[in-house]
Amino acid sequence: MNEKANVSKELNARHRKILEGLLKHPENRECADCKTKGPRWASVNLGIFICMQCSGIHRSLGVHISKVRSATLDTWLPEQVAFIQSMGNDKANSYWEAELPPNYDRVGIENFIRAKYEEKRWVSRGEKARSPPRVEQERRKSVERSGPGYEHGHSSSPVNLFEERKTIPASRTRNNVAATRINLPVPPQGPSQVIKPQQKMESAATPVEREKQAVNVAPASDPPKVDFATDLFNMLSMDDSTTNTSEATPGDTPADDNSWAGFQSAGSGQTAEKIVTAKPAESSSPPASSSDFEDLFKDTPNLTTQQAPKDVKGDIMSLFEKTNIVSPFAMHQQQVAMLAQQQALYMAAAKAAGGTPNGVNQQAIANALNVASANWSNPGGYQIPGMTNPVGGQADLQKLMQNMNMNANMNTRPAQPQENTLQYPSSSFYTMGQANQVNGMTPNSTGKPQSSSATQPTSTTPSSQSGKDFDFSSLMDGMFTKH
């Protein structure tokens, strides 16, 4: 708010007359800094009259040090006029120039003014502890406001202002202390007042306990999420042995099976928990103590373990026993072992024949083939994935054995030469050993049969064939189909 607006024209004219009278005083006829005659400007903060040149320098110092006003043109406030009346040039210089040398050269007036008011170079050492005139000005302002001519409704004295400032924080602190005291709990005054709150607390505790019971019952009523997993697990079981094993006692199953049984019987255990936890909710009387809740939680595991756990491990092992799928690598290993056994049988038959003619050797080999094919038709009930066995049953197997015996009998005729053994093409399923002769044929690098007659003459004498030289792949041609 601009305080100059409150100054009326009559008051402004009165202030102007006062200032003109102050300028006529002998101490104020010269500038306070440069001693120029006829000053028309004044420093409101310092309470001195200065010339126009020094007024510009005072403006550069800042309003916190010197606030410049025109003595004849500007509007003055009542407190400013009262302060400059009390100060004047002589009184102000007695403070600012207390230690100034008597004939000091004031040529550099700007440096002189800055050293005088900013640096306080010539202020007496004892006077530096005292307040400068501008502080006294503030005090005078408060005194001016307390006068009867000041119409702004301020306090009567600066002392009262200071006392009011002290009382305001004190009252605030008292209110804060009172507020904190209200938040503190009130101590009990007698035994009669203590008994009633205890009864209220007991009555209030019963609904809280009932709410806790309701909260405990609510989760048990939710549908169990484990049922989906158990249903999926029951779908994977392949036999009905679980119904027989459910009658076993818990001690019959090992420790690791109990974990699987606990996983499968989780659904039935939750149903038992539903029945047990619903009983306190149905009863109207509240529980006597917290031990009842502990008993409820202690009883629930016993109910869940009453049912005998199912032999889940047996069900899982039955899955592996019932399966008919075997890896090709395992099947290949079994076939290699069987072929090695057949070779041993052929070698034994060849040694037993000794120098017998070719027909006898062929008969022994045919008998060995009957035994090997009977064992090899369905080894262990396994089947190679992607291949089917054409032999449907025992009747087909017997027909195949009869055909093999007929072929063997045809080969045992004495008039048949050695080259009759070439009637079966070499299309073996597995190539055994290195490039050996098979029925007078030698396999080349391209897999095509090549007659041994091109490399060596055909022997007319009967020679015994070993088991590894016999090729029975033609008999099994078509038994395996490609996937």
UniProtKB/Swiss-Prot annotation:
Residues 16-130 form the Arf-GAP domain. Its main location: Golgi. Residues 239-248, 261-271, 434-448 have a biased composition (Polar residues). Expressed in inflorescence stems, abscission zones, stigmas, roots, roots meristems, embryos, and floral and leaf vasculatures. It is found in: Golgi apparatus, trans-Golgi network; Endosome; Cytoplasmic vesicle, Clathrin-coated vesicle. Changing C51Y: In nev-1; impaired floral organ shedding. Pfam families: ArfGap. It comes from the Eukaryota. GO terms for cellular component: clathrin-coated vesicle; endosome; trans-Golgi network. GTPase-activating protein (GAP) for ADP ribosylation factor (ARF). Mediates clathrin-dependent trafficking of vacuolar cargo from the trans-Golgi network (TGN). Promotes plant growth. Involved in the regulation of membrane trafficking and cell separation during floral organ shedding and abscission. Prevents abscission zone (AZ) cells enlargement. Exhibits ARF-GTPase activity toward ARF1 at TGN. This is ADP-ribosylation factor GTPase-activating protein AGD5. It comes from Arabidopsis thaliana. The gene is AGD5.
